[in-house]
């Protein structure tokens, strides 16, 4: 694989870390700024909503520009946002830093996917894209636990300083290692042609499933530090190691979910969302039992991220004419789900329903996502059957209308 892919993955690692590590540091950040848990939760919701704006707005704005300079500019934006977060002295400067960093998120992964695919032969494109997204997976498996540990040991600001350094390293790597021609073999289309791909009803159903399917897990994950310490009885110092368990489940689920989706996307998503709903409900019921909590964490990460490859593949399948914008839009949809889950979980805590209530809220969102996915799958099956029926009828009519072969006497 080209070394430029490592630079792309490093950028993905930094972006994934800045998105997810805040969950483990939320109690420390809330205490430092003197705000409630729900108010601190907006550092996650605000980030997620800004990702949506960047995924759609920035990606649409740069579809006709050279991709390597755009990626570099996005990382400069990412670095600036994390630098502001690391130095923020109050709630709102921190929020502004989160928003600035988030604007680069969706566009980076959307455009980066095209660049990664352009660096390798056609037979290796999927592997190249997967390698770039390995940075995001590694951020959850290793970055979040150790970023949380660093924040607890040296203060949460130290984690954001570290993320800033990672961003600088990724920027240097992209400038030095990514070829200027990468991703230019497929010329960017006009914004009108990219938007035209969104006329498909299945694209919109897929985006709704992404929002609900991913939002359910984030309803539980956003306030997981509170659940682990206040309900399960774990010491705050053990939270980073428990997040390793979550990350290992995530890595395993992401890998196996991709293989299952290669065989049948719709069936995989319906089954995985159904199992995730059950896992979340069992987690809410057994959160007071430490051993069962550890098992639930692994399963929540596994089944939560087993949806990701299928959700991304489904949107791309039904929007083949919009490779850049569809990819960015689905990244935005993941983060709408992130914001929805975080907001609803915070609302249940504010209502005095306790620290397991975000998990129940997540289960409800996931069940809704499963229902939409089942509807979308059934609709797709009906359309496929109808298309085969029409095709067969046209073929039969053509054969009937053809004249009999004329036999020439010898």
Show the residue positions of the predicted features.
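Helix-breaking motifs and short loop linkers at transmembrane-helix boundaries and internal kinks
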Residues: 34, 66, 87-93, 233, ...
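Helix-to-loop junctions at the C-terminal end of transmembrane segments
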Residues: 54-66, 253-265, 349-350
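C-terminal membrane-cytosol helix-exit motif in multi-pass small-molecule transporters
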Residues: 164-184, 372-376
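Conserved MFS/SLC helix-loop-helix module at the cytosolic interface between two early adjacent transmembrane helices
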Residues: 53-92
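Paired small-residue
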Residues: 6, 81-84, 92-101, 291-299
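Juxtamembrane intracellular "pre-TM" segments in multi-pass secondary transporters
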Residues: 178-209
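Cytoplasmic helix-loop-helix junction between adjacent transmembrane helices
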Residues: 97-135
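C-terminal transmembrane helical hairpin of 12-TM major facilitator-type secondary transporters
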Residues: 267-311
């Amino acid at each position: 694989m080209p070394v430029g892919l490592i630079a792309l993955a490093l950028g993905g690692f930094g972006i994934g870390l800045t998105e997810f590590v805040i969950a483990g540091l939320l109690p420390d950040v809330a205490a430092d700024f003197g705000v409630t848990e729900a108010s601190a939760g907006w550092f996650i919701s605000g980030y997620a909503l800004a990702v949506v704006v960047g995924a759609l707005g920035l990606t649409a704005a740069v579809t006709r520009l050279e991709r390597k300079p755009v990626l570099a500019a996005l990382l400069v934006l990412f670095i600036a946002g994390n630098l502001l977060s690391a130095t923020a002295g109050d709630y709102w400067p921190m929020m502004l830093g989160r928003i600035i960093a988030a604007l680069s998120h969706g566009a980076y992964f959307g455009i980066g996917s095209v660049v990664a695919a352009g660096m390798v032969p056609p037979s290796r494109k999927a592997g190249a894209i997967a390698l770039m997204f390995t940075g995001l997976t590694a951020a959850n498996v290793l970055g979040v636990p150790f970023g949380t540990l660093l924040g607890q040991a040296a203060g949460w600001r130290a984690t954001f300083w570290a993320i800033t350094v990672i961003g600088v390293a990724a920027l240097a790597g992209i400038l030095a290692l990514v070829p200027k021609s990468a991703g230019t073999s497929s010329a960017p289309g006009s914004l009108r042609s990219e938007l035209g791909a969104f006329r498909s009803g299945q694209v919109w159903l897929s985006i709704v499933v992404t929002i609900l399917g991913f939002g359910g897990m984030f309803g539980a994950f956003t306030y997981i530090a509170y659940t682990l310490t206040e309900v399960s009885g774990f010491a705050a110092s053990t939270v980073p190691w428990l997040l390793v368990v979550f990350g290992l489940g995530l890595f395993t689920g992401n890998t196996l979910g991709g293989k299952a989706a290669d065989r049948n996307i719709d069936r995989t998503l319906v089954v995985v969302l159904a199992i995730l709903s059950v896992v979340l409900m069992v987690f809410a019921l057994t959160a007071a039992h430490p051993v069962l909590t550890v098992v639930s964490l692994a399963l929540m990460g596994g089944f939560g991220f087993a949806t990701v490859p299928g959700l991304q593949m489904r949107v791309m399948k039904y929007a083949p004419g919009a490779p850049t914008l569809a990819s960015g839009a689905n990244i935005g949809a993941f983060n709408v789900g992130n914001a929805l889950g975080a907001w609803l979980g915070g609302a249940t805590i504010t209502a005095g329903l306790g620290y397991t209530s975000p998990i129940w809220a997540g289960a409800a969102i996931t069940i809704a996502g499963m229902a939409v996915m089942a509807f979308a799958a059934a609709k797709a099956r009906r359309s496929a059957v109808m298309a085969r029926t029409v095709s067969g009828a046209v073929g039969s009519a053509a054969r009937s209308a053809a004249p009999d072969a004329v036999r020439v006497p010898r």
